[in-house]
Amino acid sequence: MKKLIGKKWLLLKAVATFLLSGCASLEQKAQDSVKEVTENVTQTISNDQRIPADFVRHVDGDTTVLKIDGKEQKVRFLLIDTPETVKPKTKVQPFGLEASKRTKELLSTASEITFEYDKGDKTDRYGRALGYIFVDGTLLQKTLVSEGLARVAYVKEPTTKYLAELEQAQEQAKNESLGIWSIPGYVTQRGFSK
């Protein structure tokens, strides 16, 4: 009888060991799958990778809708602010229409549009993707700032990859009194005064 119990106990141990090793194997496979998916997503939205995009529709000077990875996304341009044209309960601000038209013109005539995330948040509180837009290889934000149609704004670490470049362009636009800089006192730390 003891021999029979011992054999049953041994058999039970063997079955338990087999099952546990199978579970561990399944758990490891699941972890490997999760890791692989995470790595693929991370590669897709790498901080230094420009993602091909298509222009869908225009919103205003610093916001647009692009098709990225086959999905339409509202995109807010990082590190800049243009005068308002579509904000509820806000009058159209000076140079807002010019900034809006210029953004639409550049995006609608581009041969190639690419989108790049920076470090930090990938979306804002409104669900808009946050990033840099390149039109035919040129940083769209820099074009708008250089032409006096946008100010450098919403600077938050670690989202500062092109900050120095944009600040340099802004300084030149200021010195030449272009666009928003042609109205004394119009540009403030908090936006635009009129």
Which role fits each region the language model picked out?
Residues K2-K13, L19-K194:
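Small beta-barrel nucleic-acid-binding modules, primarily SNase/OB-fold domains
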